């Protein structure tokens, strides 16, 4: 179509051409009809949106996404307003697949409870299939009984230090995580040996390499789940105190990652994911999230008198003010300064 008319073809028009002209005249592509029509339609509309973003200068030229390298394997939606996507406590009905049992029961709101499932996706990670659904829920009323604000300072020694006195340890230093990291190194070495053996013409089978890859992927997935769960628990516990606002620092994570001695530790802390999840939770509960500029000297400023200690080193874990004699943990002092900071942006 583009070669003949030299114009951009919208998604809806391309879908009509594909179904009414191209596939009937090209029998070798009839396999497209074997999957759900909504999945094909969604792929076309995704490409339509990607090209429109490119033409508007919002993003770069779209790249072809190979199916085997994508986590999302299937997309399904409601066909019209009168139909529903059936879901029960222990199973969900997926187009072309039928009823599929769910391992974790009771996580998805069911249609019997009055909820409406608008769409869903089936994805695969580390050899396991996951289904996620978009559910229409009634607006929840947020409580307005707010207390005072709090400041949160993120770090490497401890993950988060809160101005109310709470300190959340670095989970990557626990024996549980270290044990998984040790096992991950061992499995990665085994995978490397199999690759080297295959290059040298050894007897290693590709099926065995695939099995070893799954072992490594499962360990990575488990590590990611442990860290994400820890972040969710910290945010939930913080939001339950019902602060009127939460203040955090706009960390330059990309710049911090350039330090080769700290890059691994910084990446494992997942600072950006913490900010994104906190932002969503604050919006859900009507809490104001304040973002302080990264150049604000929260650690070097005395919370008692306001003087700035410019010679404070990263190795100095205790803040001692030469002006007024105030002494406190440097991270706790920073969280207090973030709480009282008056120059900020609202996320």
Residue map of PLM features:
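N-terminal cap/recognition module
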Residues: 1-15
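A generic secondary-structure signal for well-formed alpha-helical elements
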Residues: 2, 51-58, 158, 191, ...
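Surface-exposed helix-capping loop/turn segments at secondary-structure junctions
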Residues: 2-6, 55-60, 244, 282-289
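Intrinsically disordered, low-complexity regions of eukaryotic proteins
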Residues: 5-7, 36, 50, 73, ...
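Short, flexible coil/linker elements and helix-boundary hinge sites characteristic
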Residues: 5-9, 20-22, 57, 114, ...
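Intrinsic-disorder-associated interaction segments
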Residues: 7, 11, 33, 205, ...
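Acidic carboxylate diad motif detector
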Residues: 14-125, 221
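Positively charged, helix-rich recognition surfaces that bind polyanionic ligands
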Residues: 110-113, 125-347
